[in-house]
Amino acid sequence: MADLSRTLPICAKGGVAGAEELLAVATTLAAARRLRRQIDDPELRPMTTAVVEGLRTLPELEQRLRFCIEDTGRVADRASPPLGQLRQQIAAARAERRDRLNELLRRYAALLQDSVIAERNGRPVLAVKAGAASQLPGLVHDSSASGSTVFIEPQAVIPLGNRLRQLEGEEREAELAVLLELSGLVGQEAPAIEQLQQILLQLDFGLARARYGAWIGAVR
């Protein structure tokens, strides 16, 4: 069971929890739901009835969290229409920039030290022979230790790079809006989730004892 001792107070106070922290809440709710299903076993019910009376599994909250956050801890595209649209635009812009860079690799092959698209300061650059740097319009981001290579971001892709940075900033804002919404939902149920965790610990211990008793042939 995940440790929610940090996440729940943050959400209860109106703060924003991270995607992985919110996923841990969903995992805990799922564990409670599965355990509740096990309790339907008639042989276990007498022992667990008193404990389970206060168990709320919050299935709607679990479903909402699972819908918005992928198993990897990434906010899902479907979490909000703006986020999904922004990611489509980002993917399209990256593909367009990649195509242009590959075209430039072919066009300026004679000027390059190698045919690899490198990265400097988060921007794509071509490794240009220092003596030929003036023949490739663009922004110089770096040079090799020997000075024989200059890393240039071609002018042809700079506007796309700027557009990508803008879109990525908007993507982060859209992700934050989703996390804020989900954190608010968790915050509203923080007392119930805390109680649920305590009940889970009791049930887990009780079920373990029951299974052990059955294994050794104990008779109650």
Label each region the model flagged:
Residues 1-86, 189-192, 196-210, 217:
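Conserved amphipathic alpha-helical "coupling/scaffold" segments
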Residues 40, 101, 105-108, 112, ...:
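Coiled-coil heptad-register positions
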Residues 59-70, 159-180:
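Extended, charged coiled-coil "arm/hinge" scaffolds of SMC/Rad50-like chromosome-maintenance ATPases
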Residues 83-132:
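Extended, Lys/Arg-enriched charged tracts that mediate electrostatic binding to polyanionic substrates
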Residues 93, 171-206:
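Intracellular alpha-helical coupling/juxtamembrane segments of multi-pass membrane proteins
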Residues 108-124, 186, 190, 197, ...:
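Glycine/charge-rich, flexible interdomain linkers and switch-proximal surface loops
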